[in-house]
Amino acid sequence: MKINKKIFDNGLRLVHNEDTSTQMVALNIVYDVGARDEHPEHTGFAHLFEHLMFGGSVHIPDYDAPLQLAGGENNAWTNNDITNYYLTVPKSNVEIGFWLESDRMLELAFSEQSLEVQRAVVMEEFKQRCLNQPYGDVGHLLRPLAYQTHPYRWPTIGKDLSHIANATLDEVKEFFFRFYAPNNAVLAVTGNISWEETIRLTEKWFAPIPRRNVPVRQLPQEVVQTAERRQT
């Protein structure tokens, strides 16, 4: 398997593999931000933002509509370390994928309405997964036993439901401009697309996006466990 790599002037890292056995192309953008980058009293933001990224950008109010018309599909997931967005699209419509992903990296549309809609979705997910099923709170109970100082001590969905309920639009914007930047992302492209075409489309859609001042990660050092920890 041949892997091609390139780093653009704005810091975006591109990884490519060509596979001519398929008529599809997959784009995957990984942002180097996860639950570990949250404030202890404002947890769940990385996961909330995963949902907000599908609320539309400045030039594309409905993210899903053009992708569906092009025969594509998409999804995303978040963990403690990264946030991952991916889509697949027929090779004949591949530029739509570059257009969609670059536009929301550059100018996500922020609105109280979008925040309220996605907040409600995330809060319902929290209730369904953590509050309304047997042993749903196991992660919330065990993580603080395993980690007492490191931010791995809270789950990706958030430490407390109130953290999402009280999230403000200004806090959401601040989170975006801190972490969602070309110099904090890896774009992986695979499928029936050449390296030359991948470079051309990345230059066209992503290269003009300016760098942002991504903070240097300074996570607290977890202390060495020297005794048994038990939850009763």
Task: Locate the predicted segments by residue.
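Active-site SXXK
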Residues: 44-57
